[in-house]
Every structure is written in C-alpha cells, then in structure tokens.
Amino acid sequence: MDLTNATIITAMVTPFQESGEIDFDKLPQLVDYLLANHTEGVILAGTTGESPTLTHEEELQLFQRIIELIDGRIPIICGVGTNDTRDSVAFVKELATIAGIDAVLAVVPYYNKPNQEGMYQHFKTIAEASELPIILYNVPGRTAACLEVETTLRLAQLEKIVAIKECAGLDAITELIERAPKDFLVYTGEDGLAFATKALGGQGVISVASHVFGSSMYEMYQALEQGNLPEAAKIQRQLLPKMNALFSVPSPAPVKAALNHLGIPVGNLRLPLVACTPEEEQRIIRTLEI
C-alpha cells in the first residue's frame, strides 16, 4: 500500500500498563478510535511512541499486533532510525521479512552530529539495503543536526526514498515542495503547519494532534481540496492553540493525558519522561475543550 492517499498520518502513542509493560490489550480500542477519526496511516515506534525506551523485541511485537489489527486498511510505517547506520540497515532488512509493513521512518542520526555528506551516506546506505520505501525524518530540535534541503533533494533521487517528515520549518517545506520530484511526498511533522503545508502543495501532516482532533483536521483538508480556503483556515486557527497545548510539556505526556481523559486508556509514560502534573493536565484539558 502506497502513501498517496495518506494525508493525515498519526504518530501513534504506545499504551503502557501500570507496571510499565506495553499494554497490548489496549491496542484494539486505540486503533479503532484512530480509524474512526480519519487517521489515514500510522507511524509506530516513533518519537510519540516513545521509541527510545522500547526494546527491539517490544518493537517487533508492537508491529505484529498492529499489522493484525489494521489488516491492510491504512498504511503502517515503522520507525527504524538510529544513530548507527549498520544497526538501521539490519533493522530495515529484518522488517522486509514481515508482511504488512508499508514503509519505514528513518530519523537523522542524533547525538553524533554528522555533516551533510555523513547524513547523505547514512540514508543512501539504508536505502540501498531496504526493500521497503523510506520516509526521511528531519527533526533538528531533537537530533541536534539538520538535514539541509539540498541534501534531501539528493536523497529524493534514490528509488527507495519516497517522502520526508520535515520539522525544520515552513521555508524548508516550501522549497522541497517546489524543487523535489513530483512523486516525492512532503509531510510536515508540526501540527501547527498542517494547513500551510497542504495549501502549498505538500502531502499533509504526520501528526500528534490527530489523536484528539483527527476529524477536525480531516474536515480542514477536505475544505482545502474543495477550494474552500476560508473554512480550512478557520479550522486551523481554531485548532492552533489546542495543538500547541499538546506540546506544552514534553510530548507525549499531554496527548496521553488527553486520550485517557477521552476514555481511550493508554496509561503512563516510561522514564525519563513523566506524566503531566495534575495542574498541567487540568490546564491542557481545559485548553483542548474535551
């Protein structure tokens, strides 16, 4: 399944039990809820899924369970990015043997701080080893390294690299939409830029807010596609403070609090992340108006 119909992709949270183990029993309700609210693809074991605290075996178990639950209805994208190229290569080769995975998400190497040629060679090596399509993930606020537009454009020439989740701002998004091959999909990874990215001709958004406001975001994109710019802009303006509230303390604490409040139990977080304080949670829920 390709990504051409996936405009709102949810970077899915990972439910945990009180003991800290993955709560696989909570996944069916979460998946059904996301599908009912217009999620058009899911990313597993990404930033929002708390990938740094998941073991390799846990990730594989999570992927298998979600594959069973989604059953081909929307694309499944699995996080494989590490700051070790050989490790990432081994992971993409392993995932190619699992039926039901549609693409992988590979983040810019973090902590090492490679230069642009190092980033290019990192992703090129992964692409040459992968049987699955690859989405690049540029998030300089977390990795301390930024994939520059020129490097992304070089990578976009490679067969297996099909898209980017771009979190380096609207200038980078705009230039990529203008200059990249037309079949290279540009997603924003920032909910606040969901409207602007789509309006500029991008594919859409890889979203945290879609856990809570997926239906409203879908309506916004429908309005854009129908040429109703004022209505789409109105929805984005109304959503923006709510989107910002979901990042008012380290994510995914706010969105997990929101889901729990909505009756979609996803539990707590794994250290070093911590849950919202009662005061933070009250403020967030009040802003979200849920």
Swiss-Prot record:
The keyword Cytoplasm applies. Pathway: Amino-acid biosynthesis; L-lysine biosynthesis via DAP pathway; (S)-tetrahydrodipicolinate from L-aspartate: step 3/4. The record marks T47, Y111 as: Part of a proton relay during catalysis. It catalyses: L-aspartate 4-semialdehyde + pyruvate = (2S,4S)-4-hydroxy-2,3,4,5-tetrahydrodipicolinate + H2O + H(+). It is found in: Cytoplasm. Keywords: Amino-acid biosynthesis, Cytoplasm, Diaminopimelate biosynthesis, Lyase, Lysine biosynthesis, Schiff base. It comes from the Bacteria. GO terms for biological process: diaminopimelate biosynthetic process; lysine biosynthetic process via diaminopimelate. One of its GO terms (molecular function) is 4-hydroxy-tetrahydrodipicolinate synthase activity. The active site is at Y137, K165. Pyruvate binds at T48, I206. InterPro entries: Aldolase_TIM, DapA, DapA-like, Schiff_base-form_aldolases_AS, Schiff_base-form_aldolases_CS. Its EC number is 4.3.3.7. One of its GO terms (cellular component) is cytosol. It holds the Pfam family DHDPS. Its main location: cytoplasm. Homotetramer; dimer of dimers. Catalyzes the condensation of (S)-aspartate-beta-semialdehyde [(S)-ASA] and pyruvate to 4-hydroxy-tetrahydrodipicolinate (HTPA). Belongs to the DapA family. This is 4-hydroxy-tetrahydrodipicolinate synthase.
